[in-house]
Regions:
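Conserved phosphate-binding/catalytic region of the ribokinase-like
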Residues: 4-7, 190-279
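HhH-family (HhH-GPD) DNA N-glycosylase catalytic core used in base-excision repair
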Residues: 280-599
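Conserved beta-alpha-beta core of the PfkB/ribokinase-like small-molecule kinase fold
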Residues: 122-189, 204-207
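Short beta-strand scaffold segments in enzyme catalytic cores
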Residues: 40, 85-88, 206-210
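Alpha-helix C-terminal capping segments
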Residues: 39-48, 242-245
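Conserved N-terminal subdomain of the carbohydrate kinase-like
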Residues: 7-9, 18-29, 44-124, 138-146
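Active-site metal-binding loops of divalent metal-dependent hydrolases
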Residues: 14-16, 34, 234
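A short, aliphatic-rich alpha-helical micro-motif
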Residues: 116-117, 167, 192
Length: 599
């Protein structure tokens, strides 16, 4: 989903192997090993991969195709010294290791690892000796490398305490549901420190991504499984490559699930040795993109004077140079969601409330209330102040002229504030230090977004609406707090105004009449219904941005200004809309009505 400025690099510490597989009444000899599957999957997903492991000389024919795709570094060994595994897959889903020969795996040395530099990514496979894996993970992490690790059930049973230390040393930890149960007790108890991520693969049930304490479930494509070997490692390599490229972990996991599903339809790593691009994440075909309409709307935005980036200055915003500016925007943007009222399972009206003698709507109200908050108690907007904020205190700071907090999402707001503050404190970050860390990267925007993927109030949304909005604000303010690297731009900022515009313009088309009827009736939708619309709108806006050639900040401001031209409660003012000649005028459609803290 992200735009690559260069191919990400992944180091894989772990040896390929030569295996004997038993499945569905068949016995097959195959190239294998976690290092091989992980490396090939990452390479196919766009990464440059270096595998660190003893290298056989001569190269066995079974490994020759993989060797051509990977940068395999390590001391020479005879082929018979490679690890060997004999694995049986039982009809009930269990895996039995009949034989495991460690071979040269124990000969991997840290000195063989090339200098990757801070910010690089590495994966340490689940070595037969978890202490060896732990040593690699710790040393790589100390060198500033983003480290992923995996495990295997027998290793957890025999060395649970060591594997838990591996979890602590990992930025990204991969396991299956059985292993998660052995480590944490159950899937629902999986938790790690802020800034850490656990991926739990669940076979046909998909995967769970846990960002610190926040779980996000991912569906898996349905396929006819032939050989399950390497599914978890394929997932791992794809996910790490996509995270290194800039994707949110949950979006990376969707692509990883699609690649893992394809891998199990063949024997061994065959699906990873093709030149075709990796499979796309499944799309809900109830909502489709209209390519012709997208092209026409992109043409309008390319030349429309209304498509200009907003600088986020004015009466509701801090003056340039105000010392509270960063805290105002970091804490305030996390609260930019849910400005609408519901009654009897349907959308009732947008939120409008009096403040300073003026009736202000939704986002405008929030910014004005936060401006007052910054004047009254600026220390409360710092991470430390947000972390300890009580519900009553939040209500008092957001009070309208009648003395009440009018925000319709209720307790979601103070909970969001505390999540933001607590994660920032746990990570040792302030808004200024987070920006400094991003600025030190050769891809500042990508690093900025990945840091927010660790912070409450932002991390929960795979589509990064609030993260992208904050990036746009900080780059467009007069202070230019955030710079972008070459070819970097913010991802689509898809809120409910944007979705309403996309539906009515016709850049996305609802092919399912039942869903279209629910949208038109403004009914509260299920999560699956909402996701179908929002994901399609995200893709449509990304394509409008690509075709139109305008910065995403300008594209976003065009869509946001459409909230007045094509509003929620009154007839659209089509003559005032620059996109009117390209519009499908599907004005009966309405944005997904779905209560979320994402937008």
């Amino acid at each position: 989903m992200s735009r690559l400025t260069s191919r990400p690099r992944l180091l894989v510490v772990g040896s390929p192997s030569l295996d004997l597989l038993h499945f569905k009444g068949r016995s097959v000899r195959s190239a294998g090993g976690a290092g091989l599957y992980t490396g090939l999957a990452a390479q196919r997903a766009g990464a440059e991969v270096t595998v660190v492991a003893p290298r056989p000389d001569p190269m066995p024919p079974a490994l020759a195709a993989a060797d051509r795709r990977l940068d395999w570094r390590g001391p020479s060994i005879p082929p018979e010294a490679l690890p060997h595994f004999e694995i049986e897959y039982l009809p009930d889903g269990r895996t039995v290791y009949r034989r495991a020969v460690r071979g040269s795996e124990g000969d991997i040395r840290y000195g063989d690892v090339p200098d990757a530099g801070p910010g690089a990514f590495a994966y340490v496979v689940p070595l037969l000796d978890p202490e060896l894996q732990l040593g690699f993970a710790r040393r790589l992490s100390e060198a500033g490398v983003r480290v992923g690790c995996g495990t295997y059930a027998p290793g957890v049973r025999q060395h649970r305490d060591v594997v838990l230390r591996v979890v602590e040393a990992s930025h990204y930890f991969f396991c299956n549901a059985e292993e998660a149960g052995l480590l944490w007790g159950s899937l629902d108890e999986v938790r790690v420190a802020p800034g850490r991520v656990v991926f739990v693969t669940r076979g046909a049930q998909g995967a769970r991504v846990v960002l610190g304490d926040r779980p996000i479930d991912i569906a898996a494509p349905r396929v006819d499984e032939l050989d399950p070997t390497g599914a978890g490692d394929t997932f791992c390599g794809t996910a790490l490559a996509r995270i290194a490229a800039g994707d949110h972990p949950a979006i990376a996991a969707r692509g990883a699930a699609a690649c893992a599903a394809q891998t199990v339809t063949g024997v061994g790593p065959a699906a990873l040795l093709v030149d075709d691009p990796p499979p796309l994440s499944p799309r809900d075909d109830r909502v489709r993109l209209d390519s012709d309409r997208i092209r026409r709307v992109a043409g309008v935005i390319a030349s429309a004077p209304e498509a200009t980036a907003f600088d986020f200055t004015g009466p509701a915003f801090p003056e340039p140079g105000d010392p509270a500016t960063l805290d105002y925007f970091f804490a305030g943007t996390a609260q930019q969601f849910g400005f609408w009222l519901e009654r009897d399972g349907r959308y009732e009206a947008p939120m409008v409330a009096p403040l300073g003698g003026r009736a202000l709507k939704g986002s405008d109200y929030l910014w004005a209330a936060f401006r007052r908050w910054a004047a009254e108690a600026p220390d409360q907007l710092t991470p430390a102040g947000q972390a300890t904020l009580g519900d009553a205190d939040f209500d008092r700071r957001l009070r309208d002229d009648d003395g009440r907090n009018p925000l319709p999402a209720g307790p979601l707001h103070p909970a969001c504030a505390r999540g933001y503050g607590r994660d920032m404190l746990a990570l040792g970050l302030t808004p200024a230090s987070l920006l400094a860390e991003a600025d030190a990267s050769d891809r500042p925007l990508a690093r900025f977004l990945s840091l927010l993927d660790c912070v409450g109030g932002y991390k929960e949304d795979p589509w990064r609406k609030k993260s992208a909005l904050l990036a746009a604000i900080l780059s467009q303010r007069p202070e230019r707090f955030l710079r972008f690297g070459d070819a970097e731009d913010v991802p689509p900022i898809v809120d409910y105004h944007c979705q309403r515009s996309c539906l009515r313009l016709g850049v996305v088309a609802v092919a399912d009449e039942a869903l279209a009827s629910r949208l038109a009736a403004r009914e509260v939708l299920s999560g699956d219904d909402e996701e179908a619309v929002r994901a399609a709108c995200w893709e449509a806006v990304a394509e409008i941005h690509r075709l139109g050639g305008r910065p995403m900040g300008a594209v976003d401001w065009f869509f946001f200004q459409n909230r007045t031209r094509c509003p929620e409660m009154s007839k659209p003012d089509c003559p005032a809309c620059p996109a009117d000649p390209a519009c499908a005028h599907r004005t009966r459609l309405f944005q997904p009505v779905f209560r979320t803290a994402a937008y």
